[in-house]
Regions:
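C-terminal beta-signal and adjacent terminal beta-strands/loops
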Residues: 684-687, 788-789, 888-902, 928-990
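N-terminal Sec signal peptide and the immediately downstream disordered periplasmic leader
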Residues: 2-111
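Surface-exposed extracellular loop regions of Gram-negative outer-membrane beta-barrel proteins
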Residues: 272, 280, 494-501, 518-544, ...
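C-terminal beta-barrel architecture of Gram-negative outer-membrane proteins
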Residues: 640-644, 819, 827-828, 859-934, ...
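Extracytoplasmic beta-strand/coil segments of soluble accessory domains associated
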Residues: 66-79, 83-87, 97-153, 160
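Outer-membrane beta-barrel translocator/receptor signature
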Residues: 158-160, 171-248, 256-260, 384, ...
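Outer-membrane beta-barrel transmembrane strands
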Residues: 138, 149, 246, 313-339, ...
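Flexible glycine-rich, low-complexity coil/linker segments exposed to the extracellular/periplasmic environment
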Residues: 290-369, 426-451, 500-565, 695-756, ...
Length: 990
């Protein structure tokens, strides 16, 4: 059994494809006498599609209703026979929502929404990659093209069918999110006719989009070539914000003989994304104004910190810079200034001195849509990808496919602003660093952080072999119905990737410090950093007539500044699909086994890990009648934890597992003009990675240090008198606390960044979908979704560590919680806090109690209910013939943003949640279609108004409680809702 896989793994995917292409000619040699007859009477496209289980026939779709899908078993299956929850977006539906990219699609599917943040990504960094969304309350970033994982964002200019699978499904993807996955195929070529189309789109944000496609048969019904090109400049509603893309796709479809299909697809392109942080800009000017506009007393050349006033009558409103900073003042001729610690800046906003980041910049100070990072937050990615597939009917009922894909990307990420630094500051310094009077004293400004460039390279190769056999069961009858048929399939795949990253920081050569860029607001400066920062430069000029300041790009040496990763996954799966009793009963079952090997070559976390997992998916559909069906499905998948982070015990984290149970019914009413489904689901995600452990590592490290310090000062006699061991307990040498102590200096004081923990969560709810074609002219789609996402377990690895070592620590604390006499002067933390060991353990236990108090409560950001409506009506006769009107509406329930505190414990109380109001938005469009140039060209035009009812408003996605004072909730994160925009598109097809 090991012989074939071992031989296969010795071949590269491209050698396999070359062998397959050579083998593709074999049927032609064996069937030479049949070729002439085939050429004389070529099969129709419908006949060929029906014989090929790897391709669906989109021509069978009606309006928004899809007839076939690959997203049940990876093979062509009628949608009504699929047991797992799947939504298929037809071409008409995509046109009516005006979708061209992933971002346009995600808000229109049931149970999904735009991703904001989650427990392992509090800053929302993953929202920028163009493929992350939230499904059933879980973060999902699985996108596959032709069932190969891809990191290139979806665009409809070169894609075919698009499907959303909700919940885990190992038949489709063994490695992925519990929320589901988005799958799409390459746009197929046509062998029967030549086609061309040209699309143009513009909007009121200044966006432009141009698409040209051509399909040209070279040998009718045998060979066709296709070409597609995209040029897009897509601006967002924030300023500045944009996603630009230039792509070219070449394709070929070759059918040398009737039962052989060879396909080739190659895409090359470049992405440029200017990605604002999604959260509102904070206001750090209000406290300074409220406190009486305090000023610093800076001393140029001094190394002393500025000590701000702070008393009951004089609130603290300014802070020392803390470190020497090189600052370039944009829009002036000033040289680069080196500000020392005696200079200051306006303090962050605090509510009652407790809550931070509760105030956003007033629109009069900074327009709402302005992004303070300006053009300094740009990502450029060049990519190329090639996919080859050979599909062959070997024998009647037996088909095989061999496919390979290669994808390479090179990225350059320019970052100048952290999400916590997205703020409007105030300048309280009466003089400049050169001692001259400061003309900007008392003025607000925005400032970039360290200028950094991250260079990355990702190379991915994958191949798979698929075999499927359709078996007709004996012609027995049960309950008067034929037994039916069975489809058996097997898939073997390998995927190997290598990624490299290094981070460069721009520093001033002479002083070695980081260079920051400051822009004072108002006047002629505009509102954000100027166009000059679009460029990467090695010298920063101070202004006209001022000598340049020499800078150098330094490569970081800390953990996370350099990284090389390797990843390889082998997967073998078997799927069976039985259609029984005259297709009244559909049974699907599959098992998949993945072996994932990941390696990390990082200065802070070099390691190798092998993860193996078996997952199954099985389900059934019972057609009670021609209009009513019942279905049930169970699915699993997993995601390797990888080597980038480890638990507090310095061991690899457990694998992330997904499990889901789905039950429901489907119906087709009114002569199949109304289709619908109702689903109840219960989805779990186990061992989700959450944030770093810096704080808890500190706490545990303090406990070990305190005990070790005490033993270093006590005599054997004292220990014996206290009935304590003669030597201290052995601290694990390879756990996080030991590594923290050893590597703190090596990792910029934050080795905790490589340590993480896990949590479990669960989402339960319902999904209702209705799709109708009431008349040949009217299309309608409506969905309602509910999900209640809760945390079921948290801090799992830390709690195990705590339970293991707590008995040892408690030996040094008596039952009353005081320090063991006579050691009360020794078992005290050897730092400025001077905490007793008992106090430390009590604080740790209190933190765990607070975590446990939240278990069972809804997760932050959860919007329990949502609904989507899309409709279009086309006039086919009369004076309005050729016109169409339609629109869409999306409603989102209130969002959970925090919890009130329990007065008795001070912990957050899940029974007292705080919510942000819900919202709804609406799009409308009017279109026209007509034939021109003697009916040889179809001309379509469309005018769309997006977010018709949306002014520029913030909505809160997180809040904190002012526990010690009012007990009220105050927003700590706000997201700006998209404002109204107008879009004009036109297309020509011939």
């Amino acid at each position: 059994m090991q012989l074939i896989p071992s031989l296969i793994t010795q071949l590269s995917p491209w050698r396999l494809v070359r062998l397959a292409l050579a083998a593709a000619g074999l049927p032609g040699l064996l069937s030479a006498q049949k070729i002439a007859a085939t050429a004389a009477n070529p099969p129709t496209p419908a006949e060929v599609v029906e014989l090929n289980p790897f391709i669906v026939d989109a021509s069978r779709d009606t309006g928004y209703v899809a007839a076939e899908t690959l997203s049940g078993t990876r093979l062509k299956t009628e949608v009504r026979h699929v047991a797992s929850p799947v939504t298929i977006l037809t071409e008409e539906f995509l046109q009516d929502i005006g979708a061209t990219s992933f971002a346009d699609i995600v808000e229109f599917m049931p149970g999904t929404e735009t991703y904001r943040f989650d427990d392992s990504d509090l800053r929302g960094e993953q929202a920028h990659n163009g493929r992350t969304f939230s499904a059933r309350g879980f973060r999902a970033d699985n996108q596959s093209r032709d069932f190969f994982n891809t990191g290139i964002p979806l665009d409809t200019y070169n894609t075919g069918p698009i499907s959303l699978n909700r919940g885990p499904n190992s038949n489709l993807f063994g490695i992925g999110s519990a929320g589901g996955a988005l799958t799409f195929g390459s746009r197929p070529g046509r062998l029967d006719r030549a086609t061309q189309d040209l699309e143009l789109k513009f909007d009121s944000n200044g966006s432009q989009r141009y698409v040209y496609r051509r399909n040209q048969p070279i040998v009718p019904q045998k060979l066709t070539l296709s070409f597609a090109a995209l040029q897009e400049q897509r601006n967002g509603f924030r300023r500045p914000e944009g996603n630009d893309r230039t792509s070219v796709t070449l394709g070929a479809e070759w059918r040398p003989v009737r039962h052989t299909t060879i396909g080739l697809n190659h895409e090359r392109g470049e992405l440029k994304n200017l990605r604002p942080y999604q959260f509102a800009t904070y206001d750090w000017t209000a406290p300074w104004i409220a406190a009486g506009r305090q000023l610093t007393t800076p001393v140029p050349g001094s190394s002393a910190d500025f000590t701000p006033p702070n008393s009951a009558s004089v609130p603290r409103a300014i802070e020392s810079l803390g470190n020497s900073s090189f600052i370039r003042i944009l829009g002036t001729d000033y040289p680069i200034f080196e500000y020392n610690r005696s200079f200051g800046y306006g303090r962050r906003t605090y509510l009652n001195g407790v809550l931070e980041r509760v105030s956003v910049a007033d629109s009069r100070l900074l327009p709402l849509e302005t992004y303070t990072g300006g053009f300094g937050q740009v990502n450029r990615t060049s990519f190329d990808t090639t996919m080859v597939r050979v599909q062959q009917r070997l024998l009647p009922g037996l088909h095989a496919e061999l496919a390979a894909r290669r994808e390479n990307t090179d990225g350059r990420d320019h970052g100048m602003l952290g999400s916590n630094e997205q703020a409007v500051y105030i300048d309280p310094n009466p003089i400049l660093a050169n001692g001259q009077p400061n003309p900007f004293v008392g003025q607000p400004y925005i400032e970039s952080a360290t200028n950094r460039v991250t260079l990355s390279e990702d190379n991915n190769e994958a191949w798979r072999f698929s075999a499927v056999y359709d078996l007709a069961l004996p012609d027995y009858r049960i309950f008067g119905r034929r037994l039916g048929r069975v489809r058996l399939s097997a898939f073997y795949s390998e995927e190997e990737s290598a990624s490299f990253m290094r981070r460069l920081t721009q520093r001033v050569r002479s002083g070695g410090g980081n260079l920051r860029h400051r822009l004072y607001l108002g006047g002629q400066n505009g509102w954000y950093l100027p166009d000059g920062l679009k460029r990467d430069y090695r010298q920063v000029r101070g202004g006209v007539g001022v000598p340049s300041v020499d800078t150098v790009w330094e490569e970081g040496t800390a953990a996370g500044d350099r990284d090389a990763r390797g990843n390889k996954t082998n997967a073998l799966s078997f799927v069976g699909h039985a259609l029984l009793l005259d297709e009244r009963l559909s049974l699907i079952a599959g098992y998949r086994e993945d072996e994932n090997t990941s390696e990390t070559f990082d200065p802070g976390a070099e390691s190798r890990k092998v993860a193996k997992n078996g997952a199954m998916t099985y389900g059934a559909v019972l057609h009670l009648s021609n209009w009513l069906s019942l279905f049930g499905n169970y699915g699993e998948n997993f995601r390797p934890a990888g080597t980038g982070r480890v638990g507090i015990d310095a061991k690899h984290l457990p694998e992330n597992l997904g499990q889901s149970r789905d039950f429901g019914l489907r119906f087709a009413l009114f002569e199949r003009k109304l289709f619908g489904s109702f689903t109840y689901y219960d989805t779990k995600q186990l061992n989700q990675v959450r944030n770093s452990l810096g704080e808890i590592i500190n706490d545990f490290d303090d406990v070990w240090d305190t005990i070790e310090y005490a033993y270093s000062t006590l005599s054997p006699a004292t220990l014996a008198a206290a009935r304590l061991p003669a030597s201290p307990p052995t601290r694990p040498t390879d756990d996080a606390t030991a590594i923290y102590s050893r590597n703190s200096a090596e990792n910029n004081g934050n080795p905790g960044a490589i340590f993480a923990d896990t949590l479990d969560s669960r989402s339960k709810g319902i999904e209702l979908e209705l799709i109708a074609n009431p008349t040949p002219n009217w299309r309608l789609s409506w969905s309602v979704s509910q999900h209640r996402s809760t945390v079921t377990a948290a801090r799992k690895t830390v709690m195990r560590y705590y339970a293991e070592h707590l008995p040892t620590w408690q030996r040094y604390v008596d039952p009353a919680g005081t320090i063991v006499a006579p050691l009360s002067t020794v078992f005290i933390q050897a730092d400025m806090r001077g905490l007793r060991l008992a106090d430390m353990l009590a604080a740790i236990a209190n933190g765990f109690d607070e975590t446990n108090a939240e278990i069972g409560g809804q997760r932050y950001g959860n919007r329990e209910w949502s609904s989507n409506l899309v409709t279009r009506y086309t006039f086919r006769e009369g004076g309005l013939k050729g016109w169409n009107v339609g629109g869409s509406a999306r409603w989102r329930d209130k969002a959970l943003v925090g919890y009130a505190a329990n007065p008795a414990t001070g912990f957050r109380n899940p029974s007292r949640p705080f919510f942000e109001r819900g919202y709804w938005t609406m799009d409308v469009f009017v279109g026209h279609s007509r034939k021109i140039f003697r009916n040889s060209v179809t001309w379509d035009s469309n005018l769309r108004v997006r977010d018709l009812n949306h002014p520029k408003v913030w909505t809160s996605v997180a809040a904190a409680v002012d526990d010690g004072f009012t007990g009220n909730a105050y927003p700590t994160r706000r997201v700006l809702m998209a404002s109204t925009s107008v879009e004009l598109s036109t297309s020509f097809r011939w």
